[in-house]
Amino acid sequence: MKRIAACLLSLCLFSPFAFANTFTTDLTDLWWNESESGWGVTATHQREVVFLTFFVYGVDSRATFYTGQASYVSQASNGALIFSGPMYETAGPWIGLPFNPNLVTIRQVGTVTFTAFVDSATLTYNVDSTVVNKSLTRQTFRSNDLTGGYAGVFRQTSAGCSTPASNATVESVVGVAITNSLTALTMTTNESGTICDYVGNYRQSGRMGSSTGTFSCPGRTGTYEMLEIEANPSGVTGRITGRSNVCSQISGRLAIVKR
């Protein structure tokens, strides 16, 4: 893996794309095709590179090890993120023997392109003359439980509002209470005594969650969609879009830490 990592490092050093993947959707996850259970791809996303590990089968129907080093190329007109790069086949010593890295062999067998939205992707790759095209989604085997009390910042931009003064970006320090189940989410935000209630469904897609529903605040009601809900022991982050009876377009981000 050291030589693979060296190849990856050379891509990073000379890549023209120098942003951190915090500015894009984090694609790190286990990806699969639900109707083809038995194979899959693990994506590890660092900065502008997605390292892909394939668990697939060779012509002898035995497990075969491939890796792909896909660097960011562009964003498609439909919003998809496009990553592409070389694909390698590796072989090495049997696990029952002391590992000798000098026995590892690496051969480039083709290229791979990973075109991803938040929770779905297309995968195109070739192994020598064999070309494969697959549709993928993040694989979910457990759902996060967001239930708890939090404090943080809610940043929202409103547009198309009936009152011009409401067309603005506002950053609010909020207290947040969330109740979450496998299929439902309720969230209450408290900004200096101004209470807003969000009630909707909940869907887990790999490490990402999402929710759609309705919200009500003093003088405002509407619909919302929360995307890229990520949770860890410290807190929760996510993106939100929606509309209300006052503004036709709302977008923003939520970042909250556990109390």
Question: What label would you give each PLM region?
Answer:
Residues M1-I4:
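Positively charged n-region of N-terminal signal peptides that target proteins for export
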Residues L8-L9, V109:
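Generic detector of short alpha-helix boundary/capping microenvironments
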Residues L13-F17:
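N-terminal signal peptide c-region/cleavage motif recognized by signal peptidases
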Residues N21-R259:
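Mature soluble binding/inhibitory domains
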Residues C7-L8, A18:
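Cleavable N-terminal signal peptides
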